[in-house]
Amino acid sequence: MTDLLLDGSEADNAQTVLNAARIELLSPRLANQIAAGEVVERPASVIKELLENSLDSGARRIDIDVEQAGIKLLKVRDDGGGISSDDLPLALARHATSKIRDLEDLERVMSLGFRGEALASISSVARLTLTSRTRDADQAWQVETEGRDMDARVQPAAHPVGTSVEVRDLFFNTPARRKFLKAEKTEFDHLHEVIKRMALARFDVAFHLRHNGKTVLSLHEAHDDTARARRVSAICGPGFLEQALPIEIERNGLHLWGWVGLPTFSRSQADLQYFFVNGRAVRDKLVAHAVRQAYRDVLFNGRHPTFVLFFEVDPAAVDVNVHPTKHEVRFRDGRMVHDFLYGTLHRALGDVRPENQLGGSVPAAAEPRPTGPDAGEFGPQGEMRLANNVLEQPQGEPFARPAGGGSGSGYQYSPRPTTGVPVAEAQSAYREFFAPLPGTTPSALPESPSDIPPLGYALAQLKGIYILAENAHGLVLVDMHAAHERIMYERLKIAMANEGLSGQPLLVPESIAVSQREADCAEEHITTFQRLGFELQRLGPETLAIRQIPALLKQAEANRLVSDVLADLMEYGTSDRVQAHMNELLGTMACHGAIRANRRLAIPEMNGLLRDMENTERSGQCNHGRPTWTQMGLSDLDKLFLRGQ
């Protein structure tokens, strides 16, 4: 064996490595900076932690001042209970909190913050000053940290009851982190979004935001339905509530309320989705999956639903201590929560009918306005009156221009010769042209606007594609193929639900390789697969045999579908893969069976289609998410012709 000798420089390097490998206690500042890597990602992360502390303190008004998107300055001031002078040093210490005392408190925590590390992390990467005063204190106190050990320095200050936290020069001592920040507008958009989420979570708190000296957001306390709706409109835009369904349901200790946008108000990005669990804004895969399922049949490809939903559940049934940012939660019974959310939203969207989308009540009959020659217009259809002096104008008689009409005053215009049609004959021709079609009489139409169906009565068909109808609000345009496709699709789904998913045994069972966890999951949910039309048998630790598949499925699709269902069952405790696949097949059948373009329909057939739409779930969209009808009110039509301007 040959001995390897190290020269002097190599030995020194080896000794250095050995010395570096020794375990040492990190300084408090370095430890906090490491923790800040998880908690403080950008200015929006800072504002989230500070707002949570303000809300937990019982604040009813929060003022936020920001400069350069929070990178230069971020100041939060509240009127909460404040912090006593004795507790101020602990407020900036790691793992120090007033919100929990033991594990039982953690398992039922209702406060937004509880980890006791936010202020310590922020103060390690920025210049932080905290000033506070309690209601029973004679004066306020201020605390700052300094040095490698982050020693707290407390001194008297002037401040009303409440707390102010001032954060300056974010990431001044960690320039590498600062390089990852985006443009000022991007960072402010993230910060603004956090504040909007907090404002939606707490209607009872006033929020005021200023950026670079300019007021950006000013929201007063909202204690009634009108004020809450006003706040939602201010944050989500006025169009949201106009195109949203209010929902509220409570069952088995689960309470869900809020607003879900109609499919016609979908977005190209998922930027108008707010979900709160016990007042905490969360982003959860289980919730996203339930919402996606509920909207599955009514959203166009690539579109995202809109919603503001508040979910309330026993605190012991949800774990909020999943991630330092507290964005994620874990439900104790995820499947029950998933099914509750999906079922509630699915029913709410299914109950939408044209009358809901038209805004409810029929508009009151307007005062008759003058028409015809007196108003400078033609008369209404069937009563078009032509002035005698026009029809009886002498042939070749010039229209004399007023004297002094400028350079063209000597020009005279002679109209083309007319045939001299008598007035009575012309009026008779117009009456015949506008006479009602055979089979439709005025007596068959409703006598009052309240008797008119939501989609009204058909007037005509355009290019064999669209139905034109009149309702109490104005003109209705219907894509007849898309509408009939939805009607057929819903009827096929009902028939399938009544008959169930019948299974077809395979002559030769097919084996599928899975993981041991997937095989265990298949055994645990064997009845679920049976309801879906499958018959599975475990052949080994990592092998399943497929003995029966749903009758409508092809054998080649069975393996992939079983794998997808298993993945869903392990992730969410439930799966809709088979149903979704069946719906695709039914949708194809409905598409091929629906009325095709260029097919001429009689008026009674068009009216029959309109009545079917009014009584069909989700009739506002076809199977692919495209709208099936639209409304043009009288005001919209007046704008096209510049009436009333």
Curated annotation (Swiss-Prot):
One GO MF term: ATP binding
Is this entry keyworded rRNA-binding?
no
| UniProt key word DNA damage | yes
What is a biological process (GO) this protein takes part in?
Answer: mismatch repair
Cross-referenced SUPFAM superfamilies: ATPase domain of HSP90 chaperone/DNA topoisomerase II/histidine kinase, DNA mismatch repair protein MutL, Ribosomal protein S5 domain 2-like
One cellular-component annotation, GO: mismatch repair complex
**Residues annotated as region Disordered?**
353-381, 395-420
Gene3D superfamilies reported in the protein's UniProt record: 3.30.230.10, Histidine kinase-like ATPase, C-terminal domain, MutL, C-terminal domain, dimerisation subdomain, MutL, C-terminal domain, regulatory subdomain
Spell out the SMART domains in the cross-references. DNA_mis_repair (SM01340), MutL_C (SM00853)
What does the sequence similarity comment in the record state about its family? Belongs to the DNA mismatch repair MutL/HexB family.
Stated role: This protein is involved in the repair of mismatches in DNA. It is required for dam-dependent methyl-directed DNA mismatch repair. May act as a 'molecular matchmaker', a protein that promotes the formation of a stable complex between two or more DNA-binding proteins in an ATP-dependent manner without itself being part of a final effector complex.
Its name, as the record gives it, is DNA mismatch repair protein MutL
Species whose genome carries this gene:
Pseudomonas syringae pv. tomato (strain ATCC BAA-871 / DC3000)
Q: Which gene encodes it?
A: mutL
